Amino acid sequence: MAKKMLMMVYAAAMAVAVANPLPERVKGLATENIPWRSVGPGGGGWIQSILWSRHAKDRLFVGCDVGGFYVSENAGRHYEMRNRGLKHMYVETIAEHPSNPDILFLGTLGGIYKTTDRGQTWLEKRSGLPPISDSQHTIQISKFVFAPGNPDTLYAAVGQPRTRKGARGQIWRSDDCGETWRMVVKSGLDKNIDIYDLAVAADNPNRMLAATNKGLFRSDDAGETWAPSNDGLPSHLRTRHLAWSPSDPKVVYVTLMQVGGEKTWSAGVYRSEDGGRTWQPRSNGLKQLAGKPGSNDQLCTWTDCLAVDPRNPDVVWTGGASWWYTGVYGTTNGGQNWKRAFPDERPGWLKFWGPTVMCLSLSPADPSRLAFGTSGMVYTTEDGAVTWAQRYSEERTDGKIVGTGLDVTCLHSVTPSRHQRGKFYLGYYDIGLLVTDDDGRSLTRQMTGVPGKFSNSCFCVAEAPDDPQTVWAGFGSWGDGGSGCVAKSTDGGQTWLPCTNAASGWIDTHVRDLTVLGSKPNYHLLYASPKGLIESVDGGATWACVDLAEFPEAPRVRALAHDGGRLYAGVAGAKGEGGAVYGRDTAWRRLTPASLQIGQIKDVAVEGARILVTARNEYRDHTFRAGGAWFSTDAGATWRKVFSDKFCGAAVISGGELFVSLTDHPYHDHCVGGGVIHSRDDGATWTHLDGPGLQNWNASALAVDPFDRKSLWVGTGGNSVFVGRLP
């Protein structure tokens, strides 16, 4: 009996391990499961794929470029994130099993994933596919299609519709419902072909069409051999998406892309009435602007995604794909005439982006329902495009923003107020600064006064030590080479005034980090930048570069910290040296010896005499320098490496406990990060903080609530913020 019980416990433990596989980077650590809740505004990031379920009218699936996978059971009014088991969060395509509602497939930039429990857990399906790479994407999936009449057979096309940089000329086939795969193409598609879409005829599982960067290709032998099928299409052959009519297999539609600056407009929708052999233009009513010479593809007009009514081959929907041509367009006569079907007035809190359509789905269970995703929003109609609703956040009349589970945003920083319990400043990519004053239950976007050219991102926030209403923040565009500004608020962050006038000595550069000391009226500000450490001793009225005398070049300063009067700066390595930490009481001096060979510094945290510095792997000047975490207990007099990892990110010390985030870049097959690790013994041992409520391990920002040290805030690269409750 005891042996049987032991085996049951072991089996249960193994089931949990399989259901929630840990990243390789933390498999050697003990796991501490804690409760988590999500905080976010809803929307705000790229919606890359969307699909109405064929099995349940109210079920809607959404896939995003950094946020993974979401399910709504009430037609988009609320969502659940379901990312456990995914090792890549860019979901290009979603496929639902024709007869089993619990089986789904995700095509990501890093490969194929399958669930048998409707997304509660995912397993990677790699058998037969190329080996996993740590340096590149080996198989970027653009589309799945099931073979009609055989739900165990499905195809996976390889391509990258968004970047148009996924050319491999590959289509893979599985005959055991995705468990194993084989390359099916024998001829006709070369390695320079980027497959954007794939379709199969409803009445013939052997007949297929592929839309590619080099035109349409047709196969009549289940994908083994291919031939061009472009009769009637423009000569540029920039085909994009396909829609094969389920009710009339002779009817197929395809969209073509316009390239900015070409003299003649040659995009639009084309229709075939012979199964894709010949094509006729069907663009009457669609705007036809070629754009100015030298302009990019977003400054002309073209449509991209397609959906055809399963009952009527003449009822079709398409989505505007450029900045100048947004929203959804419909036809009821096979494309003879198109009309805009989406209103100019957009509901929801995201007003500063247009509804450029990135994905589109017509419900097979109820064709009066249409859903589309944009670079930040989801919209649906349930009455055939008569009325529309936003489906990414709650509709409020009090100016507050409350998400509904579809959080698709990335964080630069999480900054708790030192003065007001429950107030946090959240610095986002793309949407700027959002603030909560009720512990994350609602948010407000606080960007009034920030110049438009700096409004993309908020990188950092710092409150005055003695005044809760006085706040500074760093705004700007991505990247070290970007432009930026420091702005000041005297009303708790509601409005801002840039500290960047020409007479101030302001140095236009990216603002990586910011710290404030002193008291009214002469606050002491420092900000970290690629052009050095920039200082103001008069609250931002004037600025000057700080001389770090020991550093042989103009330092690229990456992080700042202070505890009391002492300042610390994490600095990128100069020629021949690794990263370094500097400290200042009365003068700056280097604290880390060159022998440490620290990689690219990401963060510095301090509490009393304890200093924690994190870094990622770096290869520079023909020398590899490792990432990890280094720790000092004596104000920088001595150091030891307490954790090794290729990409350590944010660092926090709270009540003597250490926290480090493990992140990653998104340019290889497995790139979900490693979550958060925690040490209670000065880095001698570490535990991995996990739990089913944490749906994103790509932790980019950390903070502990100063009013409640058991509350850990984790900003992520894709799913906004998670708040964990420490034991």
Model regions: which residues?
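Hydrophobic h-region of N-terminal signal peptides that target proteins for export
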Residues: Y10-A19
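Extracellular glycan-interacting surfaces
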Residues: A2, V18-P727
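Sec-dependent signal peptide recognition
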Residues: K3-A11
